[in-house]
């Protein structure tokens, strides 16, 4: 039954190399890569290994049925077997390349169409990410300058990129700055001590694979929910929301 079904779906290999099916496979893999990249952009995932893994897995599933059919039908003759072997090899390589090309196309499409821009977006993890017009280093400098001008303390800066370099590893520019107002922070910790785990405020400037720079901070309102803060913290949280928003907007803008 399986062989009869494959015979219906696959052209006889004795007719020559199944180019039409190969083209269909490549197109399917390209579209898969495009959709995968757009979805990754939508959910704000920058894990390249995960994206590629999803794409490759889908690509393999797309052409596996064709490859299996080719192998089954190859039993007809040696020439058919050679055609099947060539098809499987070309299909695997072309499928991988098509998936990668589709992922690149999806990323470019998202940039051009602004379909899923992460600009000023709050995602489920409580992170607010805005695109910065400046380099990572300059963005962090602007965070520090604005925070100080608003009476906040700048506690420390951590250059993750430099740390990676010292460890002999590669990492795009990534820098963390910690700042805040002890008066507001103390009120929050008097309410729930565990919020000290997320204080002072942290801002991370980072460069993505396309060279764009982003500034990510914790959403103070989300932190209030995470630590189940009470009414006594409302004023301090509102002040933190305003202060963090002002600093972020200035640091990432003109």
Curated annotation (Swiss-Prot):
Record lineage: Bacteria, Pseudomonadati, Pseudomonadota, Alphaproteobacteria, Hyphomicrobiales
A GO BP entry: cellular detoxification of fluoride
Protein location: Cell inner membrane
Family recorded in the similarity comment: Belongs to the fluoride channel Fluc/FEX (TC 1.A.43) family.
Predominant cellular place of this UniProt entry's protein: membrane
Name of this chain's protein: Fluoride-specific ion channel FluC 1
Organism expressing this protein natively: Brucella suis biovar 1 (strain 1330)
Name of the encoding gene: fluC1
Superkingdom classification of source: Bacteria
Function: Fluoride-specific ion channel. Important for reducing fluoride concentration in the cell, thus reducing its toxicity.
Membrane topology label: Multi-pass membrane protein
A single cellular component GO annotation: plasma membrane
């Amino acid at each position: 039954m399986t062989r009869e079904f494959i015979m219906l779906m696959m052209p006889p290999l004795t007719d020559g190399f199944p180019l039409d099916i190969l083209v269909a496979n490549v197109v399917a893999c390209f579209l898969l890569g495009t959709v995968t990249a757009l979805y990754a952009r939508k959910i704000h995932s920058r894990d390249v290994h995960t994206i590629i893994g999803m794409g490759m897995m889908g690509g393999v599933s797309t052409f596996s049925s064709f490859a299996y059919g080719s192998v089954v039908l190859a039993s007809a003759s040696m020439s058919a077997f050679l055609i099947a072997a060539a098809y499987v090899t070309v299909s695997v390589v072309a499928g991988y390349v098509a998936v990668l090309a589709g992922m690149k196309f999806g990323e470019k499409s998202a940039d051009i169409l602004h379909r899923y821009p992460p600009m000023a977006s709050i995602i489920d993890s409580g992170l607010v990410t805005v695109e910065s017009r400046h380099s990572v280093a300059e963005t962090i400098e602007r965070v520090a300058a604005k925070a100080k001008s608003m009476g906040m303390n700048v506690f420390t800066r951590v250059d993750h990129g430099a740390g990676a370099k010292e460890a002999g590893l590669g990492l795009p520019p990534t820098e963390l700055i910690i700042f805040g107002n002890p008066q507001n922070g103390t009120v929050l910790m008097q309410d729930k001590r565990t919020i000290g785990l997320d204080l002072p405020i942290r801002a991370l400037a980072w460069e993505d694979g396309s060279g764009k720079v982003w500034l990510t901070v914790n959403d103070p309102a989300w932190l209030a929910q995470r630590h189940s803060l009470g009414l006594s913290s409302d004023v301090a949280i509102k002040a933190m929301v305003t202060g963090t928003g002002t600093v972020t907007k200035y640091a990432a803008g003109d």
